[in-house]
Regions:
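Alpha-helical scaffold domains
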Residues: 1-181
Length: 181
């Protein structure tokens, strides 16, 4: 994994992610590099490589790092794009690794204008996915989304709209369950 301190093209990143297919040790090294290096460019490239791994490789080899990646994503002074790290977590989120702290972080920072729009939209997307595992949290997400009603940036508008679809479907399922009782 030399040259990760240099700026890589998308083609190079995709090629590196393909080289790592079914390489548990190599993927583990990339995860460790992303989480532990002080060099922002190396961490960014490592995160980008992890993002482009196949779904199978992520599930098998990146999932064990979920808690470390989640903790890292919630650091106040993250030295790479938070949205990129959150996009990795979105694909890894399951009912088994649900973290209330991460959900709360997403809600709190999704309305924080100090965060980039891409990070905020990824927080909304991740929170919506997490609500699928714990439907009782849909009302909290809806309250957060209400605060974003007048946001004008396309990424946040789209993330909000898609998250509201999740909230509405969860509410509909909840109403159907109540009617059966």
């Amino acid at each position: 994994m030399e040259h990760l301190q240099d700026r890589l093209s998308k083609w190079q990143v995709v090629a590196l992610s393909r080289e790592l297919h079914h390489d548990e040790a190599g993927i583990g090294k990339v995860c460790d590099l992303m989480l532990c290096t002080e060099d922002a460019q190396s961490a960014y490239n490592a995160a980008w490589i992890l993002y482009y791994l196949s779904a199978e490789d992520k599930r098998l080899y990146v999932s064990p790092f979920y808690d470390k990646i989640a903790d890292w994503a919630m650091k106040p002074c993250l030295h790479i794009r938070r949205g990129l790290v959150l996009s990795i977590l979105i694909e890894l989120s399951t009912k088994q690794n649900f973290r209330t702290g991460l959900f709360d972080f997403c809600l709190a920072h999704a309305v924080d204008k100090k965060e980039s729009d891409s990070s905020r939209s990824m927080m909304i997307k991740l929170a919506a996915k997490m609500c699928r595992f714990v439907p009782e949290l849909a009302n909290e997400l809806a309250a957060c989304l209400d605060m974003l009603e007048y946001e004008m940036t396309p990424s946040i508008v789209a993330a909000r709209r898609n998250a509201m679809k999740v909230v509405e479907s969860l509410r509909k399922k909840n109403d159907e369950l109540k009617n059966k009782i």
